[in-house]
Amino acid sequence: VTAAAKTPSGSIFAGSSDREDVDVYQDGEKTTIRVEDPTDAMIAVPVSGGEDSVYRINRRTTIIQNINVADKSAGAVLRVGLGVGTITPGAQGMALATDTIGKQFGVYLTNDVIRLHQTTPTTGAPWAIAWDDKRQQVWVATTDDNKIRRYQLGSGQGEELEAYNSIENTQSLVALPDGMILAASATGTDVQVITP
């Protein structure tokens, strides 16, 4: 298992980078869902008053796919630009995905089927991405120029609000409930704290 996600209802979804299936563990039972490509990363996103969303990505084929939680089946597949990097949960079933090669990030939603809601170009090559629930904004770390940028999502595409210098090779980014941003390097022991 290389990727797993737990829904608020307690179901566990698990995938592997060398198998074309996703295992679902619920109420002591295991169900296996067949998918077209292996899984590199997976997230679960809660939805108030609705069915939780589960998304997975495959970097080789640069795709994102939703997994239907209720009937435990594979959902639709969309391409993520030129080279998907990472995904992170957003608000109300939203998934955010970076397109590292295409220098953009996408906002995905799923009700009955996955949809690309909008894309936003980034100045550098994005890898890590985080949803700031306090501000309802997106934070993106770009590894080619060592910056962390904050975006406001708009009706068409996101707007860059500000940029911070970051530690080298930021590949992990987290927005805490109080609005503090934590960034971690993949090549060292450095951790950066941003308090906007």
What do the PLM-derived regions correspond to, one by one?
Residues V1, D27-V35, D71-R79, V113-T120, ...:
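A short beta-strand motif characteristic of beta-propeller blades
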Residues E168-P196:
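Blade-level signature of beta-propeller repeat domains, shared across WD40, Kelch, NHL, RCC1
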